[in-house]
Amino acid sequence: MEEIPSLVIDPGSCWTRFGYAGEESPMTILPSYYGVRSDVTGRNKYVVDELQIHAPIPGMEVKNGKSNGIIQDWESTLYTWERGLKEKLQVNPTEYAMMITEPSWNPQSVRQQIMEAAFEQLHVPAFYLTKQAVCVAFANSKSTALIVDIGSDNASVTPVVDGLIIRKGIFKQSLAGDFLNANIEQLFNTMNIEFPPHYRIARKSVAIQQSGNMANGSADAVKPAVLYPPIQDLTSSYEIFQKRRVIEEWKESVLDVLDTPFDEAKASSRNPKPFEFPDGVTHKFGQERFRISEILFNPSFSASRSAETTPPQGSVGLHELVYQSILACDSELRSPLLNNIVVTGGTSLIPGLSERLQAEVQRLATGSRINVHTAETASATSNAVWFGGSILASLDNFQHLWVSKQEYDEVGVDRALFVEKRCK
């Protein structure tokens, strides 16, 4: 096939990234969450831009087109892809080969649908579907690695050997970002912390100095926040989405992981961290910021007061999930995999997590050399899947792997088997 420029789409659970193969970072990032409301004709009208989706629009439902990393809603997904390509990148997909990333457990039926969407809706001349774990390995300059991806809806461990997935070593569970969010919400309820969403804030609360106390770091009084009037007909999904936004902000700025299994005295001895809620009210958090993150290593630390905070049966600590994956691999592969553990995903950015994981895996794999690798920056971690795809799609020895439109047309009805064979 004649070499043509290529694009990479990484449709993650929280964000969808678009850009040119060969570049170090995506050009455009759109939320995988989307807003949808009916227009006067009854047709769906989608909102996919980050700023617009946070606007309080009456009647707008906020949804996610993916579940467990798998595309479920094709209409909204294609709308997002077309907006990212045609309006944000301002490219014509018919002029570019298209690489799209996928989770290692993507079912055959969805793989077929992705290929059909690329050729029949986007009308690309060439296409390839590549595993996200393989992309992360290449983004970290490795062809063999154990990829530990801690995202929003699940934590997964995937062995990659010589650029190929070892399927029997794939392990995943739902103890990840969303599960922590549910526990954070429960923590706020327990602490009687209530906060208005960002869109209600007209003016934050203000500390008032009346007798010189501000110089000592305190105030005599607080002028409360001013809120905009309630907006009628906002949907419950929008309100939940806005609460999630604040919880995510809290998680990113407050959580820490202890370097040893949770110890109350040790956690209490660490300085508390303050967090300013949207209305300007600040609360300090001590041992609870370690207790929440401990759930990733010890599921019994979950609140377990509702279905959302009860660990699914069979849930294990992250280090145990890693070790299960290692033991499922052939013995000669275990040493190179343990020496090349790569941690990625948004939830992996909690300070101290990688160091704790290394210590816990070392305890399980006594005598083995353990090396846990992380990207140098938060953005490099967040963009690792996309960047790995960018590297792969631009390699000279990859060009013969593209599936051409002519090949696709010649396959006929056996497309599911075809995509399994060509995109491994």
UniProtKB/Swiss-Prot annotation:
SUPFAM superfamilies, per the entry: Actin-like ATPase domain (SSF53067)
Keyword DNA repair among record annotations: no
InterPro entries: Actin (IPR004000), Actin_CS (IPR004001), ATPase_NBD (IPR043129)
Transcription keyword on record: yes
SMART domains the record matches: ACTIN
Transmembrane residue ranges: none
Pfam families for this protein: Actin
GO cellular component: chromatin; cytosol; Ino80 complex; nucleus; RSC-type complex; SWI/SNF complex
Subcellular location: Cytoplasm; Nucleus
GO terms of molecular function: chromatin binding
Domain of life: Eukaryota
Any one biological process term the GO annotation gives: regulation of transcription by RNA polymerase II
Similarity-based family: Belongs to the actin family.
Subunit structure: Component of the RSC complex composed of at least arp9, arp42, rsc1, rsc4, rsc7, rsc9, rsc58, sfh1, snf21, ssr1, ssr2, ssr3 and ssr4. The complex interacts with histone and histone variant components of centromeric chromatin. Component of the SWI/SNF global transcription activator complex composed of at least arp9, arp42, snf5, snf22, snf30, sbf59, sol1, ssr1, ssr2, ssr3, ssr4 and tfg3.
Protein task: Component of the chromatin structure remodeling complex (RSC), which is involved in transcription regulation and nucleosome positioning. Controls particularly membrane and organelle development genes. Part of the SWI/SNF complex, an ATP-dependent chromatin remodeling complex, required for the positive and negative regulation of gene expression of a large number of genes. It changes chromatin structure by altering DNA-histone contacts within a nucleosome, leading eventually to a change in nucleosome position, thus facilitating or repressing binding of gene-specific transcription factors.
Protein name per its UniProtKB record: SWI/SNF and RSC complexes subunit arp42
